[in-house]
């Protein structure tokens, strides 16, 4: 399934509609986990970095950041933030399924359910293998994924809509239990100077993976699972957890 057409026009208002996401708490958790493994500086890759919000948080903490994303529109937003902050961040327009770096990094992070956009098992295994290839020995990979429970009971087959002065969107979800694929149909309405609205439509796909399947693919890629947590905690995931944070290591 070709899902990596990803964010286009929505990139312009992505941050506005994500203003309910507590990136600072998320970033604090990542920094704590990195520090616990003795990684307090050096190169860190943000895989599927989007508009660079988390990339900036980690750069502010002293890490030398690389951001990879397949959406030029999202990276354009990220580079505007880079100009404002003055952080020396390298952004690369690459598909996470085929990304290439000039060398290894001490850690890789991937947030905002970016890996759920990988809809085929062999492709997710390949991404894990690429991460393993570019990690320093004993490097770590921290990522989150939406759970099966979240797609089944929280967002699957629901419609989310929001209206603001800066724009409006309608986000329709359709979850297929058999394939584990959640289809997002997004309609975006952005006001123009003439008082009319510009409409843009995008379709995205994400897949729900069981924790058992994720563990299996991590092992096949040659990495070691260290821990799985409920979102932003050090507690194990619950049956009704919507987001799992996963901590794995390059042996």
At which residue positions do the language-model features occur?
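Residue-level detector of conserved catalytic or cofactor/ligand-binding positions
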Residues: 246-251
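A short acidic, Gly/Pro-enriched loop at the edge of an enzyme's catalytic core
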Residues: 100-107
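Conserved S-adenosyl-L-methionine
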Residues: 203-205, 224-234
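SAM-dependent methyltransferase
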Residues: 142-215
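Residues lining the SAM
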Residues: 111-113
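Class I SAM-dependent methyltransferase SAM/SAH-binding core
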Residues: 45, 52-98
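Conserved class I S-adenosyl-L-methionine
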Residues: 1-40
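A short glycine-rich, Lys/Arg-flanked "PGG" loop and its adjoining helix->strand segment in the class I
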Residues: 125-137
